[in-house]
Amino acid sequence: MHPMLNIAIRAVRKGGNFIIQNYERRKFVKEDVEKNKVFLNNIIYKTNKIISEIIHKSYPYHTILKKHENILVKKNEKNTVWIITELDGKTNFLKYFPYFCVSIAVVVKNKTEISVIYDPIKNDLFTAVKGQGSQLNGYRTRCSAINTLNYSTVAVNPSNKIHNLTSSYFEIYKKLIISGISFRCTGSSILDSAYVAAGKIDCLFDFNLDPNKFVASKLQVREAGCLINNFMGEYEHNNNNYSGNITSSSKFIRLINEKIRECYLI
């Protein structure tokens, strides 16, 4: 096993265990928004501290990306950078909806070498090493081989700025629903991407392209055989927050893009 992968797994499991302890204690009150915010920030801070201590114990000279920093500004960073997402699916956590995760990505010389996504509820560990494929709990994963839109499952991470979306986006949704697609809006795009990599979900539409989250997700899906396109058919687009990405197999993306083109031709 890659030595940094071993440390990443150890760190993400310990961080996930801390989150689960607080999830099961249920100290937060659903109706008290301000108290929940303080409680959640405290959990995130302590989780980051737990994970960071494990990383720095083995790699004291590596950089851990700070919460307010963006990986895009670190593109010329020569040092190894660790990107931690302490809790993806915060609303789910507060609502007792058991769908959230912890993730770590390791970037070496501007290339993502390792990705670890951990679902502490199910104890599912998704790992990926560049050039060595992706795994779920030690077993190799591949993306879905479905070649029809009918009966397919697509996860959606809708835009936080939905008012900026044009009516054409809603026409696309309508067209795809009529084609037989079943949409899911789960609240954790990182875990969705891991499910796409494992073939549990056929495709992911992501309109909230957080670059830091995108790093861990991208390696997982690419190592599982997925492509990442935007809705215009262009490859791997992660800068425009409104265009969104489609993550799936090349065959399924081609089917999606055909339906999208039909919308623009009508």
UniProtKB/Swiss-Prot annotation:
The keyword Cytoplasm applies. Substrate binds at residues 87-90. It is found in: Cytoplasm. GO terms for cellular component: cytoplasm. Its EC number is 3.1.3.25. CDD domains: IMPase. It is an enzyme of class 3 (hydrolase). Its cofactor is Mg(2+). It catalyses: a myo-inositol phosphate + H2O = myo-inositol + phosphate. One of its GO terms (molecular function) is RNA binding. One of its GO terms (biological process) is transcription antitermination. Keywords: Chaperone, Cytoplasm, Hydrolase, Ribosome biogenesis, RNA-binding, Transcription, Transcription antitermination, Transcription regulation. Its main location: cytoplasm. Belongs to the inositol monophosphatase superfamily. Part of the processive rRNA transcription and antitermination complex (rrnTAC). The complex forms an RNA-chaperone ring around the RNA exit tunnel of RNA polymerase (RNAP). It supports rapid transcription and antitermination of rRNA operons, cotranscriptional rRNA folding, and annealing of distal rRNA regions to allow correct ribosome biogenesis. This subunit may play a central role in organizing the structure. Homodimer. The rRNA transcription and antitermination complex (rrnTAC) consists of RNA polymerase (RNAP), NusA, NusB, NusE (rpsJ), NusG, SubB, ribosomal protein S4, DNA and precursor rRNA; S4 is more flexible than other subunits. PANTHER family: INOSITOL MONOPHOSPHATASE, INOSITOL-1-MONOPHOSPHATASE-RELATED. This is Nus factor SuhB.
